[in-house]
């Protein structure tokens, strides 16, 4: 498991405004918790703590959304 910006299968982050949304999305995918990182590298995006390795995180390269 690792911490990171949770991403969909197109390498796009989950855009957010509120922490509860991210906490819920992260936990739904097996993470311990999550929050909305404002004005981060990818704008306002969900950051997950201890996300299982099988769940994609944002990697270098384009968001293909």
UniProtKB/Swiss-Prot annotation:
Pfam families: Toxin_3. The modification Arginine amide is found at residue 64. GO terms for molecular function: sodium channel inhibitor activity; toxin activity. Keywords: Amidation, Disulfide bond, Ion channel impairing toxin, Neurotoxin, Secreted, Toxin, Voltage-gated sodium channel impairing toxin. Expressed by the venom gland. One of its GO terms (biological process) is defense response. It comes from the Eukaryota. The keyword Disulfide bond applies. InterPro entries: LCN-type_CS_alpha_beta_dom (IPR044062), Scorpion_toxin-like (IPR003614), Scorpion_toxin-like_sf (IPR036574), Scorpion_toxinL (IPR018218), Scorpion_toxinL/defensin (IPR002061). Alpha toxins bind voltage-independently at site-3 of sodium channels (Nav) and inhibit the inactivation of the activated channels, thereby blocking neuronal transmission. Belongs to the long (4 C-C) scorpion toxin superfamily. Sodium channel inhibitor family. Alpha subfamily. This is Sodium channel neurotoxin MeuNaTxalpha-9. It comes from Mesobuthus eupeus (Lesser Asian scorpion).
């Amino acid at each position: 498991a690792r911490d990171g910006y949770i991403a969909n299968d197109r390498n796009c982050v989950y855009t957010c405004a509120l922490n509860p949304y991210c906490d819920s999305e992260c936990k739904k995918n097996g993470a311990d918790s999550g929050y909305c990182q404002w004005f981060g590298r990818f704008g306002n995006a969900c950051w997950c703590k201890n996300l299982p390795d099988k769940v994609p995180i944002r990697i270098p390269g384009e968001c293909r959304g």
